[in-house]
């Protein structure tokens, strides 16, 4: 994303980098949360374009943007597998791709990590960012199901944006109920509870 940019644009993007990779907010059932950027400015626009219009340019520079962060996370944790926050199959009819899944795939290939899809989204839900906190909780009831054996596994869960953490909390709960040892979350951007 920062490729082929002028010096001023590159500096503007650098300002959106989070000073601390660790997210201090604790999300239920999640052992630790990391995020690389603040969800604002060019990063916010880039994610929205990637999610809803043009993923190619975002994904082409994605690993350049976050490789150092992932290396640090891998240095602090031992993971058995990397997974993505799953989308309902109906989303593929509209966009033909799932951004977190593509992110997880690239991370697993770059860092030689096992990439599995143990969790599926079995219920079509409303878009989270359009809902209030209590509505978000209700929206995700019975939305996910674990379909692969993840007993005693340490999992890195990938998402594009986190704020209230409802989605990753529900997924982490299902993983823990299925026997996962630890669930650590990394998101490209963190929004301090204002979106998603």
Walk through the language-model features, giving the residues of each.
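Glycine-rich phosphate/pyrophosphate-handling loop used in enzymes and phosphotransfer proteins
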Residues: 1-196
